[in-house]
Amino acid sequence: MGAAALLIFLAVMVGIAALALLTSVVGPARLLAPPLSVTLAVALGLRLAVMAIAFHHTPYDVALWFRSTGEAVLQHQDPLLVLPRYEWNFLPAMPYVHALELSTGLPWEIAGKLCPLLADLVTTVLVGTLAAPERAARVRWQYAVHPLPLLVVAWHGQIEAPAVALGLAALWAARRGRTGVGGLLLGLAVSVKTWPVLFAPGVLRETPRRRWPLVAATAVLPPLLLLASMPLLLGSDMGRSLRVLGSYRGNTGIWGWTGIQRLAGNVGQGFGGPRIDPYQRMGLIAVLVALGLVVLVFWPRLTGVELTAALMLAFLVVTAGFGSQYLLWPVALLMITGGWRAWVYLTLAAGYAVFFYLVYFPAPSIAADRVLVWGSVLVIAAALLALPWERLRPESRPAGLRSSWRAPPTANDELPI
């Protein structure tokens, strides 16, 4: 992409970001709430336009690694074993989808984004379904035009989109008492990538405790079926495959505290190595502690949607490893809950993504790298701000961050012991 074209696209994305912010927090524009058909048409049009502009500029993980997983499936090979280490560390749900996408005969940079695009349209519907009824149409519109989903889904083509859609659908099913369906959807979400396990506490929060065993039993079915399919369809050596499956790591040294440590010369950058492994372990411990604290402190005070958003924000605050697509995780949930603090995160995270995809990624530089690291500190501060601290006050009413609709109460108001 030439400099002039990049500047034009940057201007367009800034305009979209301004529109999203305008329709969320500014005066009469906050009332903009088109019908679902109009919102979906705009969402589809924007995503197709970004896909077209991004053609030949798709990041290498989707352009190369994800394509390789589909090719491996078509050759009856296990992507866990034939791809280089850290390029694929998940169950074969998406490689099966990638194989189907390759079979369409479309150029991969189009075909590989079909599933994420369709999933993101489902998310556009679900954010309205999970929001308060009077806010449903407005929240759908805000998600449809927000630049962060546009970039992660249509520019990057990341599989966060189906994971988010399935996780939201699991919350929707649990809220409506469809326990078995909620468990199956949760299991499918975890089958796409590992991180949607963060939806599990929220699903349980919306489910009466006597039905928790049903959630667990149905949630394990999709992963077990996928594991059973691997030796049959992919000729997997299950011992080796399971070791690779359990070795996933995020890219360390580019975000938050590990990014600052790398700039100071104390940490390397990447997925593994002598200057990375200790910090990966520290990051894992920090994540587990942070998630545990969120559940212990906020369980009786939040709905399933709010609890899930808090868990994702806490993860982003303390994680050692990071990918730009992680920023998408809490976006739909924060739009559902609403509030100005949520929009501080939604705005800064969008700015980070615009800079990463449209400035840093096409032409990496030391200066841009430093901007991203220090910019991550601002996004982390926004994530901390977006946590529902006001709920810690005795007898606090839902206000500020929370404006989401609460379903009829369940029997889960006490701490899960």
Where are these regions (language model features)?
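Multi-pass membrane glycosyltransferase architecture that uses lipid-linked
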Residues: M1-V244, Y248-G250, Q280-I417
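Juxtamembrane membrane-water interface segments that cap and precede transmembrane helices
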Residues: Y96-G105, W257-I276
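Alpha/beta-hydrolase-fold enzymes
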Residues: T252-W255
